[in-house]
Structure formats: C-alpha cells, structure tokens
From Swiss-Prot:
Protein name: AdoMet-dependent rRNA methyltransferase SPB1
Location of the protein in the cell: Nucleus, Nucleolus
Top-level EC class as recorded in UniProt: transferase
Keyword annotations from UniProtKB, A to Z: Coiled coil, Methyltransferase, Nucleus, Ribosome biogenesis, rRNA processing, S-adenosyl-L-methionine, Transferase
Gene from which the chain derives: SPB1
Organism: Cryptococcus neoformans var. neoformans serotype D (strain JEC21 / ATCC MYA-565)
Compositionally biased region (Basic and acidic residues): 535-545, 592-610, 816-827
Length: 908
C-alpha cells in the first residue's frame, strides 16, 4: 500500500477533523450526517429521532442543531455519552430486550420519524468476519427501527461493502419505498463504508421473524445444487435486478430451513409455521437413487424427501450389490420415520456405491504417508547467508525476551513502590528465616561460629604491654572461662538472651525505618528533634549528633528531665559499641596527650576478639561493679591523693572547649599536674594490671541542670515578644484572667497519670510513639482558636517586605516629582512675561504631569507573516498601534533578546 494510503495518526487529521474542533462537534463523523441531511433533508421535519450507537455524540449534536425546537432526541450506546442539551441518552446494548424496554419508557406513545445508525463492531485482522459482524449489527438496528418507526419514516445506516450487501438491500427494499446507497464527501476514500438512506417506511402489520434473522438472511446458497434447491418442472428466468435474485434466494432458504436438522436430530419434533414453498403444493416428495448418489448435498435431500425410488436400469442394478441389504431398501421407502443411525447407514451405502461405479477413489494410506522431498543443493554463500539470518533472528528473539523480562520486572518494582511494598535493603530476600523455615536469629550459633574461627586466626594481632608480656595466653584463658559459663546457662537465661536479641532486631528495624523517613521527608527529622528536646533546640538549633558525641556523653541525666530522649539514644549507642570496655579486656589503653591539655581523659581500651562478638555475658555488670570497687580501694592509697578526684577527670571535651580563655589561663598549672598524674597512674596500672574506671556520680543527691536555670525567664520573653502561640495556652490564660481557675489548680492538674511515666528499659520506637499520644489532652475553647486565627489573618494580610519596599519607593518618587513640580510652579508664578490665565494653565499641566508620572512607551506589536498575514502589504487586519512584521525565526530571536535583556538587568 502506498504511503498516502496508510492510516497514520497525522494522516487522519484532515480538514473535517479541524472543522469539527472549530465548530465544537465531538467527532468528525458529524459532517457525514450534515452532508446526508443537505442531500435528503432528513432532520428539518423530524419531531422524534433515535440514534443507535451514538457515542461520543456527534450525530446527536447535529440532530439537536437542525431539528425543530422541542423535538425528542434519544441516544443509545454501550459507552456512556456525556450530557448534551435537549438530548436524552442511556447506556444499553441494542441487541438486548433491555434496550427495547428503555426506549419504550422514554418514548411513551411517540413514534420515531428518523432512526440513525452509525455503529461498527470492534474490528480485527479478519476482514470477512468483521464485515459480517457489521452487517449483523445493521440488521439488529433495522429490527429496532421496524418497531419504533412511524409510517413514512426514514432509516439511515452505515454498511460495509461485502458479499452480504445485496441481501441487505433486498431486505431494505421490502420495508421501504425508497432505498439509496451513497457515500458522503466527509467519508474517507480508504474506508469501505457506505451509507444507505431508506425513506417512506411501509410499516407492515406483521413481519416474519426470519425476515430479520441474520442466520436466514445471510445464509450462503451458492454451493447448493440446482436439482435440490430448484424444482425440476419450473424454471426461473435470470434477471438483471439484484433484488429479484435475492428474493429467490430467500424463498429457497425458507423452503429448506429444517432439512439438515431433520437428518442430524430427527427425534426432535418441530412445528413448521413457514407454510408451503412457492409453486410447491404437495406434501409427499420423491427422488431417484441416482440423485441421492450423484448429488452434492445428500443430507439436504434426505431431509426434504419422503421416499427414494430405483427407477431406471442403472439404479435397479444397484439393488443386486452386496451393500444393498433389505434394511437399506426398507429405509428408502419412508425417510420421515428414520432415526439417526438409519441415516448413517444410508450415507455409508452411498459411499460404497460411489466407490463401485468409480465416482470416488479409495485413498492409499501408504502413498499418503510417504512424501517425496526434493532437496535442492545450496552453494556455500547461500548456506552462510541462511546461517547468519538464523543467528540474527535468534539474537533478536533473545533481545526481545530480555527486554520483555526487564520491562516486567520494572513494572513490578514500580507497582511495589506505589503500594509501599518495599522491604529493608539489609534483608536477604532468599533467607530461609524470612520464609518461616528456621528461627529468625540465633546469637548463640553466631557466637560459637565466631569462636571457632577466632581461636586461631581471630587473635592474629597480639598486643604487648610495657614489660613485654604476651597477652594472647590470657585472652585464651578468658575465652575458655566464657565457654564454661555458656555451658552452665539454664533455659531461662537462654530465653532471656533470645528475647534481648529479638529486641535488638526490632531496634535495628526501627532505625532503618527512621532513616527511610528522613530520606523521604526532609521536615520529618526537624519535627522529631523538636519533640525530643525543645530546650536544646531553642538555644543551639537542630543538628546531627555523631556517634562520638553520643558515646562520650555520660552526664547521667535522668530520663524524666528535659532532653531525656537524647540520653536514651546516647546510652543505646554507648551500650551497643562500648560494652566491652571493662577490665576483662587485655589490651592496654592508649592515652593520647594533646598539645594543650585541659583534663585527663581515660579512653576505652581496644576491643578484643571476645568483646567484638554478638553476645554479652549476663554476669558482666556484676563483674564491672566489683572491679570498679576494687579500683576505688586501690586508688584510695596515700600515693594517689595528690592526683585529685578521678571521677572529675572523666569529663566532656566539648564542655571544656567552650570555656573562656581566662579559665584556660588559670587552669594551665592544674593541667600540668593532671598530666603528671596521668603518667603516674598509667605506670601503676601497667605494673599492677589494674584499669582506672571512672566512677559514676551518685544518684542519691539532687542533680543540678543548667538548662533549667532560666527557663521561666525565657518563656516570659517569648510570650512578651510573640504572645501566646497555642490554643491551649490561650485557653488557660483566658481561664486565669476570667478567674475560672487559679494557678494552684493548674499546678495540681499538672500532676496526673501522664506526667509520671517511667521510661527506663523501654525501646526507642515505643517511646517515640508514646511521645505523640501519651500526653494530656487540654481542652481548648472556640474563642481561643478564633483569636489565634484572627491574629494569623492579620499577619497574612500584611504585605511582604519586597512589596512594601516597592510601594515605599514608588511613594518617595511621587513625592519627589511633586516637590520638583512645585518648585517649577513657583518659578512660573514669579514670571512676568505670562498672564494669570497662562500661568494657571502651565501650573495645572505641570502638577498633572507630576502626579501621573512617566508613561511607559508602548511596545511594538510583533506580527508573524503566516496564514492570513503572509505576503500582506500595509497594516494587517485587527492590528492597532505600532507593529512589526517578522517571520517565525525572527519572532523567536526577538523573544530571546527580551529574555536576555530581562535576565541581565540588575535589580535595584
């Protein structure tokens, strides 16, 4: 097919498509009805119109436009039609009784003057099948039209040119006085559609249902033999008219309607209401045996005839055949009483007789099974070319499969993202534990595996102390002791250990969830940090806390005080990383002495193979406390009294860095003493194998928090500057002012079940959830909310700084212009050359010019020389003021220059 015949998208956007867009029609097919109405005048006198298969509604728009006002217009389609003024639409299938009932409900006692049908089925690659389906749909629409059309009405339908076209025309000709086929100009030439306009409906009182049945109207009769389909004693002269041949075909179809069913299902009784065939007034029909043997359709003959006779000598000779049994002869005598098995026996007898007389030849199975295959020799180039083609096809098929697989995987991933079905990245999707086949996590197995690997290769790096002692033997002894301790653990301890492992797993999952929330929403982290520590944010702002800060922070602040959430997170990080910093570790602590020492910091010792494991001994806290007491007793000796308080030495580096320079100068002497003390203590530790463990402060006395020092003053200052910011605060303040409550009552109400909440030992994810929902609900009043909203509206009504500055500059320029105009007016009034009237006019003009300001110069209007303005001379139509005619390229350049000029201009 040529390039101009391809039905591409852009090729179908013809002038009627553009006209439909301009005139507001929903489809370009609306112009088909416009052209048909212009030729046949179908709509001007119609008072009731039915449009079958009306979506999207283009023909309904044309009918509403050209029909008289107040007419009844009804549209039916399988798809919903958007509402149109003065048009009734509903969704139904025109082949169902439901559509017929709905039409009756809408029309009441009306009869339609016009029935339109522009529908088509969903077409595919089989043209013959699609054409038959279209013609079947046309016949169904005609069936509806015969029920609702008034006498003298019109019917317009779309038909595809096919072999059933003449049958349709014959049916139309029986029901309408005038039938014309036409093709409007708006119909594409590449389309096989034509429109049949049927006028002057006859409106018969009774129509045979078979007359509108597609099985009978479109039945193929070309293959039927003449001896069966036509009587032998009558001959119908062929006519040139297609309608006459179609009428004869329909008559023959009506006569032989049940012939095949009489043979294949003879036991089923039927009531024949079709009457006698034309020219056939007898009920008993006979045929010769030769017609049965030599005929093309023996089944049709058996169904129509009553008896088969052996008339001539040839037929009587078949009676002597071994295949002609008495049962066969008896069956031929009366065909109407035979069953299905008897008809099969007659068909087998026919095949046998045809083989005897030579009409049929028995096929040789051996010859059919063996086929001679002729292989033509191929030269080398053809073989190479064929192999290359096969390889290329295989490669293309493989690439196509891979691309399809990748697209399917991408679609699945996209669907998972849309449904929030993602899983943490650190989880293995092929892990059997996730499928429930084994336990989720077992710390004991991991620890045992670590010990098996670490006995030989885990302690590859051995640390020597100052005396040259090898610590590997001591670490091995400690590992043996730990193994013995693990063996004696009972089931309760194992259960507790697994429970702790599960809690740690949940904490890890919660941490990954928090990280994903931070990545998705930037504001989420700010909100969470504000909820955790409001006082810290008020003074220092929200900032990320590193692992070092979290591990070094050991202020011992209670969780119930302000900032308790951060303390929990820091303790969690410290216990996760620094549980091994006890005296069991055999590595010597490395003390780094900076240039400017402010205090002595005892760093954590290096982690051993045991301390880096997954499990933590349950006896470790007791051992740590016991060794801490031993170390305290050791350092109570008189030798260490000059060193000072060891607990005070373990401070925070960050707090010391924030001290003033004056304090640094005063502490220089003390730093030197601290350094000496550190050296002496480390020496003693190396000699006696003791580790200095800082003692935690006692929890007996009350702690002093610097953050609580001026909190009341800070809150007062915020209220003075910004006022009450929440509806709860406004409600409480209003109640206090109106003496509905007192300060003592408010203080008493602050002590409730939600205020005393013990947070020790609770996981972070639980505490985060409790911080949102486990808090007192203070009732608020409508007046408080209205007051806050009124204040917010007042703030929103104020202009932004940029707008206010622009207005101020504009006002200053206007004042300057007015002052300048006043000075000029004074000069004019002092002039003696002009009269009083002239002076007044000059002053009035200057003041008006100053008040008005400078007028912006009108820009030239750019007119593109295309369409109606192409090649025009003089001023284009509809253009006022200054103009400039340019082409499309120059218009883009002008816009680019404006854009560059605007971007380059500096804002004052």
């Amino acid at each position: 097919m040529g390039k101009h015949d391809k039905k591409t998208g852009k090729g179908r956007l013809d002038k009627f498509y553009r006209l439909a867009k301009e005139q507001g029609y929903r489809a370009r097919s609306a112009f088909k009805l416009v052209h048909l109405n212009r030729k046949y005048d179908l709509l001007s006198k119609a008072r009731c119109c039915i449009d079958l298969c009306a979506a999207p509604g283009g023909w309904l728009q044309v009918a509403e436009k050209y029909m008289p006002k107040g007419s009844l217009i009804i549209g039916v389609d399988l798809n919903a039609i958007k509402p149109l003024p003065h048009v009734t639409t509903f969704v139904a299938d025109i082949t169902t009784p439901h559509c017929r009932q709905t039409l009756r409900q809408h029309m009441h006692d009306w009869k339609a003057d016009l029935v339109l049908h522009d529908g088509a089925p969903n077409v595919g690659s089989a043209w013959v099948q699609d054409a038959f389906t279209q013609n079947e749909l046309v016949l169904q629409s005609l069936k509806l039209a015969t029920e609702f059309l008034a006498k003298g009405g019109s019917f317009v339908t779309k038909v595809f040119r096919s072999q059933d076209y003449n049958s349709l025309l014959w049916v139309f000709g029986q029901l309408f006085k005038s039938v014309e086929a036409t093709k409007p100009p708006s119909s594409r030439n590449v389309s096989a559609e034509i429109f049949v306009v049927c006028r002057d409906f006859i409106a018969p009182k009774h129509i045979d249902p078979k007359f509108l049945d597609p099985k009978h109207v479109f039945k193929d009769i070309a293959s039927l033999p003449t001896s069966i389909t036509e009587p032998t004693d009558t001959s119908i002269a062929p006519t040139s008219s297609s309608t006459a041949s179609a009428a004869a075909a329909a008559a023959r179809l009506a006569a032989n309607s049940h012939a095949h069913s009489n043979v294949y299902a003879p036991e089923k009784k039927r009531r024949h209401r079709e009457g006698y065939a034309e020219g056939d007034y007898t009920l008993h029909h006979t045929a010769s045996a030769e017609e049965f043997v030599r005929g093309q359709d023996p089944v049709l003959l058996l169904g129509n005839m009553n008896k088969i006779e052996f008339r001539n000598e040839t037929e009587k000779g078949w009676l002597k055949s071994r295949h002609t049994t008495p049962d066969i002869i008896a069956n031929f005598e009366d065909l109407k009483v035979l069953g299905k098995g008897d008809f099969k026996a007659l068909m087998k007898w026919r095949l046998a007789i045809r083989l005897e007389i030579g009409l049929d030849v028995k096929a040789d199975k051996t010859q059919d099974a063996t086929e001679e295959v002729v292989v033509e020799p191929m030269d080398e180039e053809e073989q190479i070319t064929e192999e290359l083609q096969k390889l290329q096809q295989a490669k293309l098929a493989k690439t196509k499969r891979e691309r399809k697989r990748a697209n399917e995987k991408k679609a699945r991933e996209l669907l998972k993202l849309q449904l929030n079905m993602t899983v943490p990245d650190d989880l293995d999707q092929n892990d059997l534990a996730l499928q429930g086949e084994e336990e989720i996590f077992d710390l004991e197995e991991g620890e045992n595996e670590a010990r098996r690997r670490g006995k030989n290769g885990g302690l590859a790096t051995l640390v020597d102390d100052g005396e040259g002692m090898d610590l590997a033997s001591e670490s091995e002894e400690e590992e043996d002791e730990d193994e013995e301790d693990d063996e004696v653990l009972d089931s309760d301890e194992e259960r507790e250990r697994k429970t702790a492992a599960l809690e740690g797993e949940l904490d890890g999952l919660y941490d990954s969830y928090v990280e994903r929330k931070k990545e998705r929403d930037a504001k989420w982290k700010v909100k969470q940090d504000r909820l955790k520590d409001k006082n810290f944010d008020a003074w220092h702002g929200i900032q990320e806390k590193s692992d070092e800060e979290g591990s070094d922070d050991d202020d011992g602040q209670d969780d119930d005080e302000e900032g308790g959430w951060d303390v929990i997170a820091q303790k969690k990080a410290k216990y996760g990383e620094g549980d091994s910093s006890d005296s069991d570790s055999d590595a010597e602590p490395e003390t780094e002495v900076p240039k400017k020492i402010k205090k002595v910091s005892f760093e954590k010792p290096a982690r051993s193979e045991k301390s880096s494991g997954l499990m933590t001994s349950l006896r470790e806290p007791e051992l740590r406390a016991q060794r801490s007491k031993q170390a305290q007793l050791w350092f109570d000796q008189p030798v260490f009294k000059e060193v000072g308080d060891l607990a005070a030495l373990d401070g925070d580096d960050e707090e010391e860095e924030e001290e003033d320079e004056s304090e640094e100068e005063e502490s220089d002497d003390e730093d030197v003493d601290m350094e000496d003390a550190s050296e002496s203590s480390s020496t003693l530790e190396g000699d006696d194998d003791f580790e200095i463990v800082p003692q935690a402060p006692e929890d007996d006395g009350p702690e002093w928090d610097v953050d609580d020092e001026d909190q009341d003053e800070v809150k007062k200052k915020v209220i003075q500057d910004k006022g009450l910011l929440t509806a709860e605060a406004v409600s409480l303040a209003t109640a206090l002012v109106n003496r509905k409550t007192t300060a003592d009552k408010l203080i008493d109400q602050g002590f409730n079940r939600l205020s005393a909440h013990n947070k020790d030992g609770l996981p972070t994810w639980f505490l985060d959830d409790e911080s949102q929902f486990y808090k007192p609900n203070i009732p608020i009043t409508k007046e408080a909310v209205d007051a806050l909203r009124a204040r917010q509206r007042a703030l929103d009504a104020r202009p932004i700084k940029k707008v206010a500055e622009a207005k101020g500059r504009k006002k200053m320029k206007a004042v300057a212009r007015m002052e300048k105009a006043k000075k000029k007016a004074d000069g004019v009034m002092e002039s003696e050359e002009m009269g009083d009237g002239e002076k007044a006019r000059q002053v009035r003009r200057m003041l008006a010019r100053a008040a008005k300001g400078k007028e912006k110069a009108k820009e030239k209007k750019i007119v593109v020389a295309k369409g109606v303005n192409k090649g025009v001379k003089g001023r284009p139509t509809g253009v006022k003021g200054k103009y400039k005619i340019v082409d499309a390229r120059m218009r883009k350049e002008v816009r680019a220059l404006k854009r560059i000029k605007k971007a380059g201009s500096k804002r004052r």
